Design a protein with these regions (language model features):
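Nucleic-acid enzyme cleavage-core boundary/entry regions
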Residues: 1-178, 185-215
Length: 215
């Protein structure tokens, strides 16, 4: 056996140990936070974020569980704006039409997203590939000219952004979902990731109720 052949197995055990400690503390961490914890604990095993990401995928496949059940939150880049209100039970209502040009940041806590109470008076949901275009549309209050909900992941969608889009589709199945992406292979790939999910998240997507989103 090659000297480094055992490293992937050791990484899995190290991540399991760290997740066990996180769950005992009843906290959640992002993948980035987990990387820094592992970098301090075992720098020779986890020199980069890529090693952590791959090990998490291996662990999810091994245990047949979601990363959230391991205490790992989805990192989210997503923003939402427009004719939609969000309310976590017992908390104040967030009106996404009043969040300014930056929009409302989508939480990476998938349990929280599942609990949100949604209300909308939009006619369309529009996925916007580019963050700059999203900002321009929100500055111009486009969602009042054409009653709509705007959502962006600033490129390829993360799990949290895609899950909120799924929640919106589940709550308002009659709302058409449109996409504003570049007319090139990269834009098509982003559209397909929103619609079908990614290969990398395939082992977990169904656990979050993910389905084919009718974009």
């Amino acid at each position: 056996m090659r000297p480094n052949a055992a490293k992937p197995f050791v990484r899995v055990w190290k991540v399991m140990e760290m997740c066990y400690q996180i769950l005992l503390q009843e906290t959640r961490v992002t993948q980035r936070e987990l990387f820094y914890k592992l970098l301090c604990d075992s720098p020779h095993l986890f020199p980069s974020q890529t090693h952590v990401n791959r090990t998490i995928q291996d662990l999810v496949a091994l245990l047949r569980c979601s990363r959230y059940s391991l205490g790992i939150m989805a990192s989210s880049r997503g923003l939402i704006a427009g004719r939609l209100t969000l309310q976590e039970p017992g908390k104040e209502v967030v009106d996404c039409s009043l969040c300014g040009s930056s929009g409302f940041a989508i939480s990476g806590d998938l349990n929280l997203l599942e609990r949100l109470v949604l209300h909308a008076d939009a006619r369309y949901v529009i996925i916007v590939e580019k963050h700059a275009i999203f900002q321009r549309l929100t500055e111009d209050r486009f969602f009042h000219q054409i009653p709509s909900i705007l959502i962006t992941a600033k490129g390829y969608p993360d799990m949290a952004t895609r899950f909120l889009l799924y929640r919106i589709n589940r709550a308002f199945p009659d709302l058409p979902i449109l996409a504003l992406v570049d007319w090139n292979p990269a834009g098509l790939a982003i559209l397909c990731t929103f619609k079908f999910g990614s290969v990398g998240m395939g082992l977990e997507a169904y656990r979050y109720g993910s389905c084919i989103i009718p974009v």
